[in-house]
């Protein structure tokens, strides 16, 4: 499908400054791929999804998990819960003709329940936990630094975005002790759901399926 418009290359190199995509080979054999024709998983790709967003012909697409989700929803032995990112309830309405930014929280929850999800959660809850963890971590680092421990790395940077963490790992490997050690809200919710919440509800962990509806493709990479 690729028409060699090179929009993916431009957004990857000039906007995101990742540099994972470029033109390789020559003439009729030219293609857009990572350097040395490496697999995308072996490249500097951060899975931010911007190349997919700007591709005008659908030559680049994300991995689709719809069939897997439908199988879980149809399985009576599974308890399927879903978490939605705050951005989703603000952006979803535009797809249905509502003014940009219109909140559709109630409609979204109703629709998800009608689709077959057993429980619907807001990732805001897990985001609060992440903020508490990051706050405790920065207080700990500052306390140690003020007590004379000069090995403490400051400032502390958030680890909420998997694309950002991936970018940092590839481009600043000598500073990996600067980002927070806290999990992202998505991952923190998954841990809480499969331990504390599952125990409280009396649901066996192996029967629980946690689904995330997120605005960023990097969340798929993070789950894998």
Q: What feature does the model see in each segment?
A:
Residues 27, 49-51, 58, 116, ...:
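Glycine-centered flexibility sites
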């Amino acid at each position: 499908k690729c028409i060699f418009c090179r929009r993916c290359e431009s957004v990857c190199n000039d906007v995101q400054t990742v540099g994972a995509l470029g033109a390789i080979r020559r003439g009729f054999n030219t293609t857009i791929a990572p350097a040395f024709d490496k697999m995308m998983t072996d490249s500097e790709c951060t899975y931010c999804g911007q190349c997919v967003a700007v591709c005008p012909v659908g030559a680049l697409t994300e991995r689709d998990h719809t069939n897997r989700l439908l199988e879980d929803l149809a399985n009576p032995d599974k308890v399927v819960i879903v978490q939605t990112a705050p951005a989703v309830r603000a952006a979803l309405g535009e797809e249905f003709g509502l003014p940009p930014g219109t909140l559709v929280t109630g409609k979204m929850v109703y629709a998800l329940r009608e689709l077959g999800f057993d429980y619907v959660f807001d990732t805001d809850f897990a985001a609060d936990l992440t903020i508490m963890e990051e706050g405790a971590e920065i207080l700990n680092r500052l306390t140690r630094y003020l007590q004379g421990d000069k090995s403490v790395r400051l400032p502390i940077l958030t680890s909420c975005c998997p694309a950002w963490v991936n970018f940092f790992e590839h481009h600043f490997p000598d500073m990996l002790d600067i980002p927070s050690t806290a999990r992202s809200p998505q991952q923190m919710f998954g841990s809480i759901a499969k331990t504390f919440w599952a125990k409280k509800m009396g649901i066996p962990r192996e029967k629980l399926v946690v689904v995330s509806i997120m605005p960023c493709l990097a969340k798929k990479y993070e789950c894998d």
